[in-house]
Amino acid sequence: MSYIQNLVFTFRSKVPVILQTESSECGLACLAMISSYYGHYETIFTLRQKYSVSIKGSSLSDLIKIAGKINLNSRPLRLEMDELSKLRLPCIIHINMDHFVVLVSVNKKIEVIDPSLGKRFYSIDEFSDIFTGIALEIWPNSKFEKNEKKEIFNFFHLLHDLKSLLPSFSYILILAVVL
């Protein structure tokens, strides 16, 4: 009976969009997206705390080491544009000689999630101009553990929790106006 609850009737899972907060965090953001895609939810904040990144950002070898520490196998590849469709997706792609993005799909358009901009679509020609030929396939190993998605702080949840204090705030406001 419990197996029925785990069934998912979608054609593919979605890679969550996780935006980088600093210019040097594109690699960490890509790892957080792929780790979360497989069910181990990580934030850039927790990855930054656990694995320091230089001010220049992450190298491919840094990403491989960090992926290994969160029980993800990885395989760096050098490839041509026509080989993109053979990659295990989602994967990390190196573009513009200094930036990592997550490759989500390869069809008539190439769909990537850029940690600095969000979801983007490129034509084959557009993508060939920025693609450096480097990819990093990532997938869970046998020790990989899924975790619960942590609730993200939401300002409106805070207001809802403070609703019981609303009468007190209104008395204070009235006193402030009167005095």
Predicted feature locations:
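Membrane-integrated ABC transporters
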Residues: M1-L179
